[in-house]
């Protein structure tokens, strides 16, 4: 807009200048003195110039002034054009820069969107986090699995030590005792040394469990002899000393096996041997003033040195009891 106004002003000045030049030329042609007039003036010494000459002089001066104005106007137009061109260049550069920045911003936004998209889909950071999580989980699973296996192995080793180790057996179960045999003789653990022995704790008034266990023991004794050729001594120890006299025990054991030895004693002696072999027993009162004895149902296999080897519960039948004892005897011989 400014450049258009400058061009219009310069055109108007040029038109005015052209008109002034025409007027000045007309004046010069109309009122210029002739050579005769000039020579007469010189002869008479009249140096006064005619009025037209002054008009011409004024016209020339005005022409110079208009020319300077024209030059200054053209210069100002050029300067204004140059100045107006610079802001456009700068503005264009700014626009280019802003466009570049916008494009760079757009690129950065695109990168950000891609980065955010990678995070959602699983970029490098997410995969690394997943890998660390997986490695940690696998390590924990491996650690707990290893600890579990180690714990199971320790339990198995301890079980084997309790079942097979003589030192562990002596410390846990067994010990010296002094009781009365069913033939009336007092015996100790030393009288049973030299042979394999199976001890069972019960009482003669037991209605069902004790008879069943003693029948199983008697059958196993014979089968052990057949399978291994080893004579195992079966021993019955009463936990009811108040009622189980020597005679009562003698009659009771002979009902199951001829080799079965019956032992009894005073309440203190029975209590001591039961404590040594970790046997539980307790009287239970009945309505008819009679009582039963609640006790542990366990058979103890003792080595020829009267060291504890292994125990067998009620869950073992004749065959499993026989196989277990034969296995322990063969392992002992090795």
From Swiss-Prot:
A GO term from the CC aspect = mitochondrion
Q: Where in the cell is it found?
A: Mitochondrion inner membrane
Keywords attached to this entry:
Chaperone, Copper, Membrane, Metal-binding, Mitochondrion, Mitochondrion inner membrane, Transit peptide, Transmembrane, Transmembrane helix
Q: Does the keyword Lipid biosynthesis apply?
A: no
- Record bears the keyword Protein transport: no
Q: By its UniProt entry, which Pfam families does this protein fall under?
A: SCO1-SenC (PF02630)
Topology of the protein relative to the lipid bilayer? Single-pass membrane protein
Q: State the Gene Ontology terms under molecular function.
A: copper ion binding
- Please note every region of biased composition (Basic and acidic residues): 79-99, 107-120
Thioredoxin domain span: 166-331
Give the disruption phenotype, in one or two sentences: Embryos arrested at various developmental stages, mostly at the heart or torpedo stage.
Q: Which InterPro entries match?
A: SCO1/SenC, Thioredoxin-like_sf, Thioredoxin_domain
Q: Where are the transmembrane segments?
A: 125-144
Alphabetical GO biological process terms: embryo development ending in seed dormancy; mitochondrial cytochrome c oxidase assembly
According to its UniProt record, in which tissues is this protein expressed?
Answer: Expressed in the whole plant with highest expression in imbibed seeds, embryos, endosperm, and root tips.
Annotated organelle transit peptide span: 1-13
Q: Which residues bind Cu cation?
A: 206, 210, 295
Which PANTHER family does the record match to this protein? Answer: AT19154P, ELECTRON TRANSPORT PROTIN SCO1/SENC FAMILY MEMBER
Q: What is this protein called?
A: Protein SCO1 homolog 1, mitochondrial
Supply the source organism for this entry: Arabidopsis thaliana (Mouse-ear cress)
What is the name of the gene encoding this protein? HCC1
């Amino acid at each position: 807009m400014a450049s258009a106004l400058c061009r219009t002003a310069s055109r108007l000045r040029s038109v005015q200048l052209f008109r002034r030049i025409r007027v000045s030329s007309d004046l010069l042609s109309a009122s210029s003195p002739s050579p005769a007039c000039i020579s007469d003036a010189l002869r008479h010494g009249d140096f006064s110039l005619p009025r037209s000459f002054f008009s011409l002089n004024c016209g020339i001066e005005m022409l110079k002034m208009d020319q300077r104005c024209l030059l200054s106007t053209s210069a100002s137009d050029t300067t204004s054009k140059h100045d107006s061109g610079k802001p456009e260049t700068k503005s264009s550069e700014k626009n280019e820069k802003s466009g570049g920045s916008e494009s760079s911003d757009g690129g950065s936004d695109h990168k950000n969107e891609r980065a955010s998209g990678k995070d959602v889909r699983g970029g490098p950071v997410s995969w690394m986090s997943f890998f660390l999580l997986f490695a940690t989980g696998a390590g924990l699973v491996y650690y707990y699995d290893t600890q579990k296996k180690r714990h199971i192995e320790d339990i198995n080793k301890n079980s084997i030590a309790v079942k097979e180790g003589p030192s562990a057996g002596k410390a846990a179960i067994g010990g010296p005792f002094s009781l009365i045999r069913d033939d009336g003789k007092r015996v100790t653990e030393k009288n049973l040394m030299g042979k394999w022995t199976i001890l069972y704790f019960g009482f003669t008034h037991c209605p069902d469990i004790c008879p069943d266990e003693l029948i199983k023991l008697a059958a196993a004794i014979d089968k052990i002899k057949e399978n291994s050729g080893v004579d195992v001594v079966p021993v019955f120890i009463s936990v009811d000393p108040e009622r189980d006299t020597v005679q009562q025990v003698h009659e009771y054991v002979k009902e199951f096996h001829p080799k079965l030895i019956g032992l009894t004693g005073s309440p203190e002696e029975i209590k001591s041997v039961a404590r040594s072999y970790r046997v539980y027993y307790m009287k239970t009162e009945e309505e008819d003033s009679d009582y039963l004895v609640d006790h542990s149902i366990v058979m103890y296999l003792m080595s020829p040195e009267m060291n504890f080897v292994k125990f067998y519960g009620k869950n073992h039948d004749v065959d499993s009891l026989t196989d277990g004892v034969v296995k322990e005897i063969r392992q002992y011989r090795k």
